Amino acid sequence: MGQKINPLGFRLGTTQNHHSFWFAQPKNYSEGLQEDKKIRNCIKNYIQKNRKKGSNRKMESDSSSEVITHIEIQKEIDTIHVIIHIGFPNLLKKKGAIEELEKDLQKEVNSVNQRLNIAIEKVKEPYRQPNILAEYIAFQLKNRVSFRKAMKKAIELTKKADIKGIKIQIAGRLAGKEIARAECIKKGRLPLQTIRAKIDYCCYPIRTIYGVLGVKIWIFVEEE
């Protein structure tokens, strides 16, 4: 029976880096992890709450707008540096957005003596990120677009990015069928067993009227 491992954890320390950079005493380690989780959830909730709503916009701009690829947290003695990597930082560029976010985050920080420093970093090639493609597919499926058409459109978007291979899998009650199944589409190379191959991965749940669908995306970026 095949054993499947998370592609990101499998390559941690080689082609993938940690998203949290700090040290703590063993007795305080769990508190640091909980604090990181609260900070990340607070940022994602803020983005989701303030995301622009409108049904007349283009699918590409709506589905990919303000999608966070990952959040880096660096802790020093008196400062917590939070670096938000985002596809299209239109929302966070608004006047007063960073200050409002800092106030929300300060409530989640354990120590009142530590100050927050938030930095926004735009992703150079958004459609190279599996999180953004997963959000795009979710937007398509929620608008009753066929799942096969949604997967093909997502792969077409990756033509703008410099990647070597991609695989998209959707599992669940596809097209409202009573029996759940999985469908996948693949293009290019995807060497999952090669550790030096830089592969980005994303697992994303989508809530539809027929139930929850699971989307998994593997992207082969380059080989180091």
Curated annotation (Swiss-Prot):
The keyword Plastid appears for this protein: yes
Gene Ontology biological process terms from the UniProt entry: translation
Keywords: Chloroplast, Plastid, Ribonucleoprotein, Ribosomal protein, RNA-binding, rRNA-binding
Plastid as UniProt keyword: yes
Chief location category: plastid
Pfam families linked: Ribosomal_S3_C
Residue span(s) of domain KH type-2: 43-124
Location(s), subcellular: Plastid, Chloroplast
Alphabetical list of Gene3D superfamilies matching this protein: 3.30.300.20, Ribosomal protein S3, C-terminal domain
Record-level Gene Ontology MF annotations: rRNA binding; structural constituent of ribosome
Gene Ontology cellular component terms for the protein in this record: chloroplast; cytosolic small ribosomal subunit
Superkingdom per UniProt: Eukaryota
Subunit comment: Part of the 30S ribosomal subunit.
Protein family per UniProt: Belongs to the universal ribosomal protein uS3 family.
Full protein name: Small ribosomal subunit protein uS3c
Organism: Sorghum bicolor (Sorghum)
